[in-house]
Amino acid sequence: MLDLKRIRTDFDTVAAKLKNRGVSEDTLTHLKELDEKRRALLVQSEELKAERNIASAAIAQAKRQKEDATQQIADMQKVSADIKTIDNQLVAIDQQVTDIITVLPNTPHDSVPVGADEEDNVEIRRWGTPRDFDFEVKAHWDLGEDLDILDWERGAKVTGARFLFYKNLGARLERALYNFMLDEHIKEGYQEIITPYMVNHDSMFGTGQYPKFKEDTFELADTNFVLIPTAEVPLTNYYRGEILDGKELPIYFTAMSPSFRSEAGSAGRDTRGLIRLHQFHKVEMVKFAKPEESYQELEKMTANAENILQKLGLPYRVISLCTGDMGFSAAKTYDLEVWIPAQNTYREISSCSNTEDFQARRAQIRYRDEADGKVKLLHTLNGSGLAVGRTVAAILENYQNEDGSVTIPEVLRPYMGGETVISPK
């Protein structure tokens, strides 16, 4: 959530930054006007309360002296009625302010490219060279069926579209991947966490999914619970409402969890395969950092995600998302896109973001600065390290062989009992 004081004191800068994110200046102007009206009403309310206190003292004095206090009582009743009217106006204005400010996206960092959509994203670097196949490559969904490791038909029967069963060495490959990813992150200083897979509405607000993106989630009817769309939500909210010791920062968390997405608005997109599912495993990284260190931590987090892809030998590129393509809470985002041979293109497999104090303000996560003793908002960061299903897809396609088998990357073999290849039965 944005700082209302910042909007008030640096309106033009905030308006210009949010314009690049599709926010109308009229919206901010209306918010500023509401804030000014609210502040004026607060002054009036305080003045009237001071009058009421004076009137109350005068009434008490008159009663002690056995004097008629009828007029003073009438005056105080009028003042009290005026205060109630103003308080009701303040409640209404506060709600209007909340309705606007809670759906405003974060302001982009100055280094973020300005653009309308993914066409304006900027490639930063590439790693690895896509393999030159001397046979016709298969898509991962066909490989999965031919190898008897992915069962789409029964997934659809048991649940519905965009669900599947992993089986045999497919299930083992998925498990090997997330154990490998977690082990690599732990080596980099991340604390492993097993989170709840359901959170409450306050947690969804804290990380920015609510109220704006409710339609993208699975809520449990007649409860305060939501299935997590990413482990970012419980990991970030772990410290919601707390004040941390500045000496403990930065703090690194990692977790593997299922992620549940309704994929509202994605009809017709990636209807086959592992790219877009309602339920998938993802290894998440979350950091809590001091503001002056958060962009250095973003580079480190991105490198942690890249490390996984490099050790798996998967070609990828790093993209800096433009203002029009970034997520709601992000101030800056790097996407990692892995090479998918059957599609002859790179597809997102990780997204690493610095939200600065946007989530921390919503969730009230603060730290006490050891230098001056003041309590301040910290910065939160989050990143995929990696999306496991998409990594399975990338391995199946990049490591496929002409005979229909798939070679298992060397780093995963210890996690798969020494298996070296997945072969057709």
From Swiss-Prot:
- A Gene Ontology molecular function term of the record: catalytic activity, acting on a protein
The UniProt entry's GO CC annotations, sorted and at most eight, read: cytoplasm
* Top-level taxon of origin: Bacteria
Can you tell me which residues bind L-serine? T230, A231, E232, E284, S384
Keywords annotated in UniProt: Aminoacyl-tRNA synthetase, ATP-binding, Cytoplasm, Ligase, Nucleotide-binding, Protein biosynthesis
Function noted in UniProt: Catalyzes the attachment of serine to tRNA(Ser). Is also able to aminoacylate tRNA(Sec) with serine, to form the misacylated tRNA L-seryl-tRNA(Sec), which will be further converted into selenocysteinyl-tRNA(Sec).
- According to UniProt, the name of this protein is Serine--tRNA ligase
Q: Species name for this entry?
A: Streptococcus pyogenes serotype M1
This chain is encoded by the gene named serS
